[in-house]
Amino acid sequence: MNRDSSRQSAIILAVIGILPVVWLGLLIAPSVKGGLPEILPSLLAVFNDPFHIELCGDSLKTVLVLLLLYGMGIGIYLSTRRNYRRREEHGSAKWGSAKAIDKKYRQSPPSENKLMTQNVRIGLNAKKHRRNLNTLVCGGSGAGKTRFYCKPNLMQTSNSSQVILDPKGEILRDVGNLLEKAGYEIKVLDLISMEKSHCYNPFVYLRNDNDIQRLVTNLFKSTTPKGSQSNDPFWDTAASMLLLALIFYLHYEAPEEEQNFAMVMEMLRAAAIEDEEDNRPSPLDNLFADLEMDNPDHIALKYYRSYHSGSAKTLKSIQITLAARLEKFNLESLAALTSADELDLASMGEKKTALFALIPDNDSSFNFLVSILYTQLFQQLFYSADHIHGGSLPIPVHFLMDEFANVSLPDDFDKILSVMRS
């Protein structure tokens, strides 16, 4: 019961108490003239015959005096009902105990908790304890971040989906079978042995033009080496316009099986300028010329015109810049991995799924794909929660980002952390 309702109940009881006070005043009124010696004996007679009331000249005065005394008593009582902390004038801080903290935050059943230490758990339903479930675990190499935090929490097999960043594939090897037996659907983005990986095609998750813009921005950010600064951002900006034109074309004009990065590379090769003096249009120019005849206001055409406004030498340099950004997609293994999609990211908030992202610990060449995966996964889960499930996902999604410093995260990751908890 909160403070307001408690005070309201006390006032109601005080008002009800007026009736017996008035009744008592009427009973003792005939004896008040004789003072206390007459009042006390009369009380015995009053209780023997409580309904024998005689009205007299002192009845009104007696009732008013008793009501005044009663009101003063109630006022003193209500004014002293405060949360006094006696003998704590100099503070009340003390060392907490693991048992007390665990009792305060744990929930039932035990599997529906996040393990903080061996003796302390915190429930996954944040609405009950009103605490943030985001956890930062710091420690040097060999401190036990994976062994004593990641693995025990995965072995809880709670009613939640798991997204695990797994350098070397150690976590998948140790707990994958356990999760599968617990009813999890296991999906793996394996950038160590790509031929064993589930396929992941970022194009599948492009719902609108804004998603395409985010994909291109994230791709350029995640393929930029840390700490590097371009003296002339023109080339990256122009290359991003060309990439936007290609992706917009595929998104709106190509069949689904051709919407992937392998086809982007095919289109880029079709734009190659062999001779700067040759003014003949390239196959890609012809493709966009046909598009202009059908739909001159097509968004892909707008970006292509912006890219194509330079000289042949400039266009060739822009193509080289973009080819350098996308050169990993020339590899057959990566092209095959991104040619289709088997991850179904949106379903992670609807059924128990464990998604492992395996990255080499000694090579960050393909980590940009994990960065794109995280960005699109956040977008898919937010959209599903807000537009399909009324604000929250049926199945909570728990991110375990082991060695996450090795992956380029979205620029607004701190904001995502602050809002995803709800």
Where are these regions (language model features)?
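Basic- and hydrophobic-enriched, low-structure N-terminal and domain-boundary segments
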Residues: 1-143, 147-153, 195
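P-loop NTPase motor domains
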Residues: 131-422
